[in-house]
Every structure is written in structure tokens, then in C-alpha cells.
Amino acid sequence: VVSQYFWPENFRINDLVKEWVQRGHEVTVLTGIPNYPAGKVFDAYQAQPSAFATYEGAEVVRVPMLPRGRGGLRLMLNYLSFVVGGGVIGPLRLRGKPADVIFVFEPSPVTVGLPAVWLGKIKNAPVVFWALDLWPETLAAIGVVRSHRVLAWVGHLVRYIYNRCTLVLGQSRGFL
């Protein structure tokens, strides 16, 4: 599983990982440092990071990334830092671990797909991408990005990611 957000952050992927382990699957989660939603690293994680190395029988591999903090620039740096950490450090930490499938959990940002598709290439594993947010449409709809050039660039990035996935799952029929 590749997800920028994971336990102790409260996301649906936590339930899926628990269920997959209960069904007998060996699950490894590649994720970042827990800091959502407040934008600062969880105190419990800072005090004892090793306590967060497993979750319900799944191995949790965390890569360094900047906390979200406040403001748009800080958020973009948070997204970019997970791409770098997940794309460079992630494969090193997962060296020697085979993968049958790479499952991507994407509530936002779509950039979580970059380290996943790179890891899929390295591991020669299919990539399944669960899109819970539409990019670049969401950026335009909520007014975060108004530049047509930036939206077009994000659209190219989305196509790059989706075209390298074996399967893209939409949250609802409206996504299709």
C-alpha cells in the first residue's frame, strides 16, 4: 500500500489494511510521518516512532516528509516531500521485499501516485490506484488554482500516473 496518510491518522485505508491482514495477506504500507490534519507531527510519534512500525499485523514503512503546516506553499512542499521520500527512500527501505500488487490510496493529492508507479516498475508489480479526489478538477472547483497552464500541467501529471496504473478505481460513477 502506498498512502501519504496512514494510522494514526484517521483514514479509510486503515480499515482496508486491517481487513486484508485478517484475510491472510501480508501487507506493507509505505507512508509518511503522521501530521494530518493539524499539520504538525503527532506528539506520540515523536516520542516513540518505533511504536508506529506495525499496524494490526501490517508492516508500516515511513519516509521523511515535511509536515503540512499552514498555507499553500507549505502544503505543496508537504506533497512534494512525500514524492521525494516515497520515490527515493521508499524503494531503498523496501529493497528485497517482493510485491504482488501496489495499492495506492489517494484522498488527495494525486502526487501520491508517483512513488507508487515508480515502485511498481521497480518491483514489476501491477499498480491499482483508488482515486477519491478528481485532479485537476478539484483544484479548479475550489479555486486553489486558477492558472490554466498550471491546471493543464496537473492534467498531464494525472494522465502520466493513470496511464502507468493497471487499474484506476473511482470513488463513484461520477468519476468515470
How does the language model describe each region?
Residues 16, 111-114, 118-126, 149-168:
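Membrane-proximal helix-turn-helix segments that form the acceptor-binding/catalytic region
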Residues 26-28, 59, 126, 167:
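Residues at the starts of beta-strands that form the adenosine-phosphate
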